């Protein structure tokens, strides 16, 4: 449990019961993005206990990597910080942590900043040199968001017609 800059903001490692909470935040962000022309996840991809999205969240929980950001008694953001990313970074070494499934409810200004800054500190405290992530290459808003924290694009590629951007930020020398 980590307190944020706002007195009532708290970051917690998710438990198995939190998969549905995380999924609901991601689905809310996906629906908003789809309705405003900012693609992220496909709406519905985290709906249902047997969905691919839920399977990934359960795997993240098992790895101890899924987190929720709370404001008071309300979950307002979710993300996974993982040791490896064999899909998007298969040849990367052990010098990074990987940020995935980062979603912040629209009403939760500042919660995303708290989460990203915590990820950067956490990677540094574990002796990692980088935090890495993938995002949709065709979403300039999310790319600008990550650039504010020092992330830079290191590669782009296409999977099933979707363009992805790989980004990283150095957290220690």
What is the role of each PLM region?
Residues 109-121, 144-148:
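Conserved acetyl-CoA-binding loop-helix of GNAT-fold acetyltransferases
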Residues 51-68, 98:
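A short helix-loop-beta-strand connector motif used in the catalytic cores of GNAT acetyltransferases and
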Residues 107, 133-143, 159-163:
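Conserved beta-strand-loop-alpha-helix junction that forms the acyl-donor binding cleft
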Residues 68, 74-83, 98, 103:
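Conserved beta-strand in the GNAT
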Residues 27-56:
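Conserved GNAT-fold acetyl-CoA-binding loop/helix
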Residues 123-135:
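Conserved GNAT acetyl-CoA-binding A-motif
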